[in-house]
């Protein structure tokens, strides 16, 4: 996620996040099959179907931005609203069967940009982009605690997305520099130990990294560089404490739009979310463009971002968070392969 948009919307969202920071923050069915047709570049064009409207534009912040879709152990979908003001729901639950929406958690300070359940303690971890913290709550929104806060190697963080390894250690994209020119690269990828909360910088001087997800076999990371519209592959050492090799894996020709969060399915395919257009782009592990998933044409005018996607574990039921002037929505489609941990939050 990035809390701003291309053009005029970028300014509005940046102001909304600044306002949060100044106040202490910064009839149901499972996912239906999407319609599809061949695209010009060989990837299929798929149309997602509206599941439910989750939020409306907040008067105080001037926008709403849904992010961080993730399923809990009981199969319930949770999302975060990045720009929700103090006191309004910042974590919400969406019943994909009844399409009912209910509040889970709020506070007076956080601007939460992603969410994922830890395999270590089954708590929901939230990245507070404005506050530079990583908080956690129970699946019911209780016992709010701060897992990590403060500087890393002398510099504050803008924690954006997160991913857990199989042991529960956390890997975070630090989007420092997101609001500046790409050549002033200050972003990082940071590993945080599950037991000690000790932070280690794995990569630095990056152009505002955003999406982060493990490969299907947990041997490496996919990292989306928001400031470069590029996805990098990082091969990790055996215990995941160092990057052994890295390379640019694919480039996104997005024009004024930029890449956002990343999810990975059981076949290793990358679902690349986008800030600036309401579509998800799907690539093979070798960089082949397999599919583009968009909202219906009559809905696209009032929606400018599809910032994240989750696939229900063990199924191909996929749900993407879509936001814009019309509000915050969840759309559903059929994924190309089954969901795994790497496509469930972050």
Where are these regions (language model features)?
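Blade-level signature of beta-propeller repeat domains, shared across WD40, Kelch, NHL, RCC1
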Residues: 305-346
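Beta-rich, blade/repeat-based domains predominating
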Residues: 60-76, 88-89, 107-125, 151-170, ...
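Conserved beta-strand positions in repeat-built beta-propeller and related beta-rich domains
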Residues: 73, 77-86, 124-130, 170-183, ...
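Secretory targeting and sorting signals
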Residues: 1-35
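Asp-box/WD-like beta-propeller blade repeats and closely related beta-sheet repeat scaffolds
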Residues: 131-167, 172-179
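A short loop-to-beta-strand structural motif that recurs across blades of beta-propeller domains
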Residues: 89-92, 133-135, 187-190, 230-232, ...
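Short loop/turn segments that connect beta-strands within beta-propeller blades
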Residues: 94-99, 138-142, 192-197, 235-240, ...
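A short helix->beta-strand "capping" segment at the edge of beta-propeller domains
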Residues: 39-63, 246
């Amino acid at each position: 996620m990035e809390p701003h948009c291309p053009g005029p919307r970028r300014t509005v969202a940046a102001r909304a996040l600044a306002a949060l920071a100044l106040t202490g923050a910064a009839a149901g069915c499972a996912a239906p099959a999407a319609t599809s047709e061949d695209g010009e570049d060989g990837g299929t064009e798929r149309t997602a179907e509206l599941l439910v409207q989750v939020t409306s534009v907040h008067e105080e912040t001037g926008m709403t931005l849904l992010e961080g879709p993730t399923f809990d152990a009981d199969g319930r979908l949770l999302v975060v609203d990045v720009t929700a003001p103090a006191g309004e729901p910042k974590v919400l639950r969406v019943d994909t069967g009844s399409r009912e929406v209910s509040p889970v958690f709020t506070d007076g300070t956080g601007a939460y940009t992603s969410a994922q359940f830890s395999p270590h303690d089954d708590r929901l971890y939230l990245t507070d982009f404005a506050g530079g913290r990583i908080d956690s709550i129970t699946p019911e929104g209780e016992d709010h605690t701060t897992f990590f806060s403060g500087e890393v190697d002398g510099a504050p963080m803008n924690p954006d997305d997160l991913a857990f390894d199989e042991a529960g250690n956390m890997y975070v994209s630090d989007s420092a520099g997101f609001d500046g020119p790409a050549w002033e690269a200050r972003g990082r990828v940071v590993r945080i130990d599950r037991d000690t909360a000790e932070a280690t910088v794995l990569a630095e001087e990056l152009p505002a990294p955003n999406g982060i997800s493990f490969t299907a076999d947990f041997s490496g990371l996919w990292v989306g560089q928001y400031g470069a519209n590029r996805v990098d592959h990082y091969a990790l050492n055996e215990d995941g404490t160092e990057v052994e090799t890295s390379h640019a894996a694919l480039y996104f020709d997005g024009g004024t739009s930029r890449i956002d969060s990343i999810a990975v399915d059981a076949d290793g395919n990358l679902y690349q979310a986008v800030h600036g257009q309401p579509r998800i782009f799907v690539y093979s592990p070798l960089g082949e463009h397999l599919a583009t998933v968009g909202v219906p044409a009559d809905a696209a005018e009032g929606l400018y971002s599809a910032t994240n996607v989750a696939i229900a574990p063990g199924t191909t039921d996929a749900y993407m968070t879509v936001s814009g002037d019309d509000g915050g929505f969840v759309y559903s489609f059929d994924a190309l392969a089954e969901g795994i941990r790497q496509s469930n939050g972050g």
